[in-house]
A protein has these predicted regions:
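Non-catalytic signal-transmission and effector/linker regions of two-component phosphorelay proteins
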Residues: 1-18, 28-35, 55, 59-60, ...
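Short acidic/polar segment at the start of the alpha1 helix of CheY-like receiver
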Residues: 23-27
Length: 157
């Protein structure tokens, strides 16, 4: 679990987003995008790590963005278990798999927004802001709409 420095208070002023992905490249890219939009971000390598974080830091996370296909626990199961802990926690599913390969899993969670990788910071912003609101204060950096996952072949979902 990365927390990007210990100098931050336990409960940041900005809404905090938890990014869950078993692949380093999309996890770090999504984390950077979330921060470029002005939000705080935490990252987890899988669903088990994400659930531990949610249990250990109740009320800190305002949104979970999770990959669909991961070892140990898929994004759908993570969504169910996270909602058991925090019933109104917004969750976004994401994947680079072709829709035909994950359609059944996505269809099982019609209430959850879905992001197809690769996506832009602007696409992410359009999903995040209605769910948790804009950042409390303007961020020093501008969201880089050109930040994209550059190598789809390097990760599997």
């Amino acid at each position: 679990m990365s927390t990007r420095g210990d100098r931050r208070s336990r409960f940041p002023a900005e809404p905090t987003v938890l990014i869950v992905d078993d692949e380093e490249t999309p996890r770090s890219t999504t984390t950077r995008m979330v921060r470029s939009l002005g939000y705080e971000a935490r990252a987890a390598r899988d669903g088990r790590e994400a659930l531990r974080y949610l249990q250990q830091h109740p009320g800190e996370i305002r949104l979970v963005i999770t990959d669909v296909i991961m070892p140990y626990m898929d994004g759908g199961e993570l969504a169910e278990r996270a909602r058991d802990l925090h019933p109104r926690l917004p969750i976004i599913l994401m994947s680079a798999y072709p829709m035909g390969e994950i359609a059944e899993l996505i269809a099982a969670y019609p209430e959850l927004p879905f992001l197809e990788k690769p996506f832009t910071a602007e696409t992410l912003r359009r999903l995040v802001v209605p769910l948790i609101g804009p950042p409390v204060k303007p961020h020093g950096r501008r969201a880089n709409d050109r930040v994209r996952y550059r190598d789809r072949a390097r990760y599997s979902g």
